[in-house]
Structure formats: C-alpha cells, structure tokens
Swiss-Prot record:
Protein name in UniProt: UPF0280 protein MTH_727
Family the entry assigns: Belongs to the UPF0280 family.
Top-level taxon: Archaea
Organism whose genome encodes this protein: Methanothermobacter thermautotrophicus (strain ATCC 29096 / DSM 1053 / JCM 10044 / NBRC 100330 / Delta H) (Methanobacterium thermoautotrophicum)
InterPro entries reported in the protein's UniProt record: ApbE-like_sf (IPR003374), MA1715-like (IPR037456), UPF0280 (IPR007183)
Amino acid sequence: MIPSDVSFNVLESWCGTMERIVIGETRINLRTELRNHGLSGFVLGERMKLMDYIRRNPEFLTSLEPIVVSEGPLIVRMMSRASRKAEVGPMASVAGTISQLSLMHLMGKGSRCSIIDNGGDIALVNNRKITVGLYAGSSSLSGTVGFLLKPGGPRGVCTSSGTVGHSISFGRADSVTVFASEASTADALATSIANSANGPDDISAVENALERADDFREHFRGVMVVVGEHAGTVGRIPRLVMTDRKAVLGDLWDEV
C-alpha cells in the first residue's frame, strides 16, 4: 500500500538506536545493530529506479490491476510479482517492497537484527522476541493487544486500513494485518483483503475480508482483520498478548 500514517517503533536500544529516513513519500523508522549501513543512499537509489521506470511506463503508477513486468529494475519486478499474487495494482506494494529491499541490503551487510518500518509496512529479522502492537484506528482493540514475534526472519508484517491514513482502500477495515515471508507480498495482500471489508454491518465486513483472505492462503502465514469491535483471523498469526495502550499508540514496538 502507499505509505500510511501508521508507525511502529522499537522502544529499547538492544537492536540499535532509532533512525529516521525521509525521502519523498518514503518515511522509514529504522532499528539496526549496524553502523555506516548506507541505507539512505540505497533507498534513494531504489526510488530513482522506480520513478525512472514510471516515467517510461506511466500505467505502472495508476493501474489498479496487476501488471506483468518481464524486464526492469528489481523493485519493479518485485512489485509486479506481488500485484499478481494479490490481484491488485503494483503500487499497492510499494512501501512493503522498499522495506523488503532495505532489509535485504542490511542483511547483505551482516545484520542479524534489523526492523524497517515504512509507514506501517515492516520487514524485519530479529534475534530476540518482539511484540508488535496492533493499531486499528478507533477500535477498542487498538493499542490493547499485540503480536508476540519469535526470533526469526526475514519476514514481513504489513497493515492496510480503510479508516486510517491516506492509502487507497475500497473497504472499511480499521486494520488488516498480514504476516508473510516477504513484506512486498504482505503489503499487496493487506490492500487486497482490506478492499473486501464491506457489508451491511461490521461482522459481515470481517467475514467478507476473511473470505477474500482465504483465496490467498498459499501466499501468507496469517491474517487478522479488525472492523470496529469485531475481529477475525485466517491462518496462523503470532500469539496475541496484552499491551499498554498509551505505550503502543506512541511507540508500537517493544522489547520482551
């Protein structure tokens, strides 16, 4: 999805100090144990490759349907692949793809603990347990529960919303969170599933979104959908834990 106003942060410094990278629409909150990682320059380069491709292929920016790309920069091919998996336009995965490429860059430099949050679309590898808080707009679940992530990765945790932020969504989910091995795919799937969160009432909206999610089970590990005071899951999501609402709504990441 296009970067939203949702943000995840790490409160403790065990995975490095918080860094902020802002380049155009890309707004990254970064935690990594690496120094002199050169991520800002890397992200700038990837954005330039994408923008150059869009100048020559403007439909890549505006299409709401998948676009097949056989040749082009890696960022473009990854977005194209994610769009085909999720049956959405390629720009639905731009934030998650940048997060994933950033993680690949850091892991290539030897990182064992890096968390890249690009407007709520996260790619990470972690060597300690982490709790990621659930931000679901005005729902009472927002900030009160989180997901306990075991050490592991690389993986993606991406969220789409029809009520929070400025991302394009045709549904009314407060949050659709997708857990997958790739942030690029998780981002596109979150958008696609959130688009189906409609119905005469909140329960129907959750059920319709979960039914849509079930179509994509081969591409994700788990999905959680929240609409108002109702929620549902498909697949296997990380263990839910209680979180401090005040802490989560300020900084949605915490060390266990």
